[in-house]
Amino acid sequence: MTFAALQEQLSEHIYHFNHGNHEAAYQFLGCHKVDQDGVTGYRFAIWAPHAANVYILGDFNHWQNEPLSHIEGGVWAGIIQGAERSQCYKVGIDHGNGHIEYKIDPFGFNFEIAPKDATVVWGLEDFEWSDQVWMNQQWRKNSVHSPLNIYEVHASSWRRHPDGRTYTFAELADSLIPYVKEMGYTHIEMMPLMDHPLDASWGYQITGYYAVCGRYGTLEEFKDFVNQASGSSWTGCLVISAVMPMPWLTMMGRQPSNIKTSTAPTTWGGGRSTST
């Protein structure tokens, strides 16, 4: 695919992104499967406005730096025809001083399980939701006068296998949903399920906002869990932590001036705090 074709695909997205009114940046940034004009592979798009160069490297190119093209507005992109689903990759950020830092893709849909830290090639596959009955019920429900009894769950510690393994989404569906029903709850509130390397953070030190934690399963398996919960007439609530990310794993290019980091100990279990 030519530079002009990439620019045509991304230009409008980039315009709205840089004007602060793109409501679904995950639809163009990150890794997306393409099949157009005889080209089949994955398109990688990275926002790194201060980088001198940006590279993609992974299983598909023997972990050699593959340069991306600067499209416009700080977005770098390229097509990797040899990339396949489930392969690992990282992003190389060249600061222009001879130093390249290797980062995860902050818009990745899947990641390796910690302590490994590569992003995994993954697409947004078509999925059949089965929650239409539940959705229709919400329009007729009087929320003010309906029962409300919320059960908050930390998926990693709610139950564990004897060998210490966490329950997967499929196992949570088989055990958590019946338990909530038996105990008379109306809502299930899941503490953050987005990708995070440290269980002890309760999911609040997030590295991948667009991926579920691989210790529980895949994005598709999470959707199955939601289908089963809504099929049992439960409302799901998902806690999202947007104030305690781990930017030193994802920051693209030179550190923006509005992000300050400190190495002082924090009460959240980390050795570095972040403020904007």
Where are these regions (language model features)?
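Short beta-strand elements bearing conserved aromatic residues within extracellular beta-rich modules
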Residues: V54-I56, Y89
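A short beta-strand segment in extracellular, disulfide-stabilized domains
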Residues: R43-A45
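Substrate-binding/active-site clefts of carbohydrate-active enzymes
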Residues: Q132-H145, I150, H154-T276
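Short loop/turn segments at connectors of secondary-structure elements within structured domains
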Residues: H50, R85-Q87, G184
